[in-house]
Amino acid sequence: MAPLLQLLWLLTLLSTVALSPVPAKPWADDEQAWNLSSQELLAPARFALDMYNYGRAAGTRAVLGAVRGRVRRAGQGSLFSLEATLEEPPCNDPLVCPLPETKKTVLCSFEVLEELKEHLLLRRDCSPVNAKVTEFRNATFSSFLPLLDKDPLPQDFSVKMAPLFKDFMTTYNRTYESREEAQWRLTVFARNMIRAQKIQALDRGTAQYGITKFSDLTEEEFHTIYLNPLLQKESGRKMSPAKSINDLAPPEWDWRKKGAVTEVKNQGMCGSCWAFSVTGNVEGQWFLNRGTLLSLSEQELLDCDKVDKACLGGLPSNAYAAIKNLGGLETEDDYGYQGHVQTCNFSAQMAKVYINDSVELSRNENKIAAWLAQKGPISVAINAFGMQFYRHGIAHPFRPLCSPWFIDHAVLLVGYGNRSNIPYWAIKNSWGSDWGEEGYYYLYRGSGACGVNTMASSAVVN
């Protein structure tokens, strides 16, 4: 790329990107954010690696580990934002390293501009994993979780996992159609135990990861069945901002203790988290404004919300509009959950609740906490990284692994507080009470962990 063109690009990007505060969800409506394929990432990632290694002798160059990224249009080119792990080789050269160093993992953020197959590195921010993480947990970070981990299992590892797998099958009442499928699931289970260990090593909170009812599912199966990719791909209906309130929040709050939250539900093998998040919010709003707690129908939204995509995902903003346009929600007892799409059977005469509007909340977590304490449970969306293996405790995933750019699961904020001086959000999930802490997930509060503050919303009941 010519020097003049480089300068023009830099001036453009500095005026539009670098000098602007980075929002929690950075893409405008006409832009896209997604998990790019390895093929799309290959060229910009290799270029960033070459720039990182520039001037290094053979044998001292880092190698590329895991990569994830997003892209947006930039004039006639593309701007790639990459998050990558680099593996640094051991260093025994006293002229380079005063003390011998073992192999280490480095976390990097790059911005690469691509135009006419030419690349320009605009930003590089790298630091060793242990510099940021070992203060939270004593662990060996050579086992850092590759996001594209396809390494072969250690020899005989599946055999060693067989007793645990047998216990898993008994605990969760698993049966398989053939011996071959059982063997395959054992292999998946064994690989998942390695993944859970790596997630555990990099969690900065008190969360424990391990065997759950999802431990025999591949990562792809889990994402396809239980998560909601539309949350990161579509913008949905615009909502008005919530009216300002007193931003002073009490030290802790829990709507479960105040009767505003129904029992934990189970979405089953259906990506309908969006419906459960919204009905949970409406249940709380109706209770606070009418004094009655009713368990409301998610199935009505699967069947009758024609904008969202039922088990293939949906957006809370669209669901609120559907409830308002339909004329309300029936109860769970009257319109029971089936876990798949059926013909819409809604009857306005059977509706027990209605909403007047919906609002979008601030991305400031202190304001979210104040709104929750004063107004009720809140529909939010998060990046579900690690939740496949979450058992209990306060999750605080390493940010590059639980990026707010890749939210894929809608849930319900019901409270907040502190455990052992660690601030948390109490989150009602929709995977049944046999997951997590009796169906609940506890996530670190105060840093926008996993994008918890990026899509907070609520119905309005007058």
UniProtKB/Swiss-Prot annotation:
Range of residues in the leader sequence: 1-19
Reactions accelerated catalytically: The recombinant enzyme cleaves synthetic substrates with Phe and Leu (better than Val) in P2, with high specificity constant (kcat/Km) comparable to that of cathepsin L
Nucleotide-binding among keywords: no
GO biological process: proteolysis
Active site: 273, 409, 429
Disulfide-bond pairs as recorded: 270-311, 304-344, 402-450
Subcellular location: Lysosome
Keywords, comma-separated and alphabetical: Disulfide bond, Glycoprotein, Hydrolase, Lysosome, Protease, Signal, Thiol protease, Zymogen
GO MF, one annotated term: cysteine-type endopeptidase activity
InterPro entries per the UniProt record, alphabetical: Papain-like_cys_pep_sf, Pept_cys_AS, Pept_his_AS, Peptidase_C1A, Peptidase_C1A_C, Peptidase_C1A_papain-like, Prot_inhib_I29
EC number: 3.4.22.41
Gene3D superfamilies: 1.10.287.2250, Cysteine proteinases
Chain's role: Thiol protease which is believed to participate in intracellular degradation and turnover of proteins. Has also been implicated in tumor invasion and metastasis.
Name listed for the protein in its UniProt record: Cathepsin F
Annotated source species: Mus musculus
